[in-house]
Amino acid sequence: MEIFGTDKAFLPLTLDKACKDDYTALTIGYANLLAGHSDPKGRSIMYMEAGRQDKTKYSRDSMVRAIWYMLHAAMESEETQKYGILFITFPAGVTMSQVDRGLIKILLPSIQGTIPIRLSAFHSCQPPAFLKLVLPFVKLFMSERTKQRILFHMGPTEKVRDKLESYGLTRDNIPQSLGGNVVVDTKAWIDSRLAAGK
C-alpha cells in the first residue's frame, strides 16, 4: 500500500494500470530483467546497472514499483517460481552520489518476505572500492539468508565472466558489459509488454 498508494494498490500490476506512471524508471536501464535468459536451473536473471541511476528522473517509489513489476514478470516462468531468481549487479562506473540509500531502505524490506520469489544468488561484478563503505548499510536491510547469497567477483571482465561461468552462467546469459552475448534492451522489452497489455 505504501509503495503503490491507495489509487494503485488494488489495480492489476500491468504497465497500463499500477505501473502507468513508471515508464522512465522501467526503461532507464538501472533494473533489467534479462527476459528469455536463465541459469541452467531455469532461474531468471535480473541485471542491475547502478551507473544508470538518475534520481532526478523518477521517484524512489516509482523505481520500487518498476522492480516489483520486473520480479512479477520473472515469476511468469514456472522455473523461476520453483527455483527463484538471481541478480547480477554491475556497479562499475557508479559514483557515491548515485548510490541511493533511501531506495535501498525502501526496496529490500518491500521485497524480502513480501514477493513470493526466492533470491538464489546476488553476483556483484567489479564493485567499486567505496562499496566497502556502503555494504554495511545495505546489509542492515537484508535477511540473514540474503546476506549469505552475496558473491563478489573482482578483476578484469574476462576473469569475472569466467567466474560467472563457474556458476553456470554462460556467455549466452551474461550481458555484453560483462563479456557475454546478451544485448540489454529493456526499453524494447517494456514496449512489447505494454503493447501486449501486460
Region annotations inferred by a language model:
Residues 1-198:
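Basic, amphipathic alpha-helical/coil surface patches used to engage anionic, phosphate-bearing ligands
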